[in-house]
């Protein structure tokens, strides 16, 4: 067996598709593009997300989610949460440990009758009490 007898394995080499080279090839005339229409023309490219007239996926699914650009202030009622009164220092991280509020919260407002009494314990500028601006 010499180099001249070597052949690739059966089915490993595909036949090259030469389109528009006569009707005898089976891919002549319309060159496998079908007759007329937008897809038969040169330069045709479907839009991203186009599904052939079917309602596209991004339009079938509902619109979800919105986050306002306004500042996010989280209100905590002091009367309902006695744990805040027991804190020696009120900081943003200590309140986060007590109340599992979302990460995007930028400030906390303490509300209720006893909130003004806690103003001296507050050690963080992101925390305000009711009546305070």
UniProtKB/Swiss-Prot annotation:
This protein's GO CC annotations: cytosolic large ribosomal subunit
SUPFAM superfamilies reported for this sequence: Ribosomal proteins L15p and L18e (SSF52080)
HAMAP family hit by this protein: Ribosomal_uL15
Family statement: Belongs to the universal ribosomal protein uL15 family.
Quaternary state and interactors: Part of the 50S ribosomal subunit.
Function, as annotated: Binds to the 23S rRNA.
Protein name as catalogued: Large ribosomal subunit protein uL15
Lineage: Bacteria, Pseudomonadati, Campylobacterota, Epsilonproteobacteria, Campylobacterales
Gene, per the UniProt record: rplO
